[in-house]
Amino acid sequence: MEDSFLQSFGRLSLQPQQQQQRQRPPRPPPRGTPPRRHSFRKHLYLLRGLPGSGKTTLARQLQHDFPRALIFSTDDFFFREDGAYEFNPDFLEEAHEWNQKRARKAMRNGISPIIIDNTNLHAWEMKPYAVMALENNYEVIFREPDTRWKFNVQELARRNIHGVSREKIHRMKERYEHDVTFHSVLHAEKPSRMNRNQDRNNALPSNNARYWNSYTEFPNRRAHGGFTNESSYHRRGGCHHGY
């Protein structure tokens, strides 16, 4: 009986099961799923926060920590060459498209990290950047200022540098979307033009802030979709090298 047992044992294969039976290949990830975290080598920081909450200070700190970082803000569109800030809500959508174009160019050139310094109240406002990140293999990192007053309307009205009134900041706070994720941003839907116009009107600065009244008052660099000197320009806190 012992000999029979040894013969049966000898016929058993000690090879791993995967060599006896061919394994099925793993299923591909669902379409629109970003690569696994370990595969990311480039980073996109999407800053969020109400006016005066400390976004620009946070952007500068990130740039200090990552000297190669580039900061892109839609606000840059409304800075004149002499450094004066003049806001025109009629060109807000164009300004966002202009900023997205700069960010896309930087991503295609492999710049990392890239920092988007915008209010980004709604998930859909960040969607173009999330799509770019997916297409160019960037990890998206959402950051908000960690200031104690970031939702204190009275303090925000006092601190913001563009003259946004307390009432408008209060309305912005009411619409602020919390707990956004990459997937919620990627699948967010852009609202109708009517709702966007309402948001645009709520973004108007207070009466003591300067703004352009007509397209003809824009500097030529704006009319042609960019700065006169495309090679380099300065903004608050850094140089963007033409992006």
Swiss-Prot record:
Keyword Ligase: no
Top-level taxonomic group: Eukaryota
A Pfam cross-reference name: AAA_33
Stretches the record annotates as Disordered: 1-38
Keywords, alphabetical: Developmental protein
Signals that turn on the gene: Up-regulated by USF1. Up-regulated by FOXO1.
UniProt function note: Might play a role in adipocyte differentiation and triglyceride accumulation.
Binding partners and assembly: Interacts with dynactin subunit proteins, including DCTN4, DCTN5 and DCTN5.
Protein name, entry field: NEDD4-binding protein 2-like 1
Native organism: Homo sapiens
Gene designation: N4BP2L1
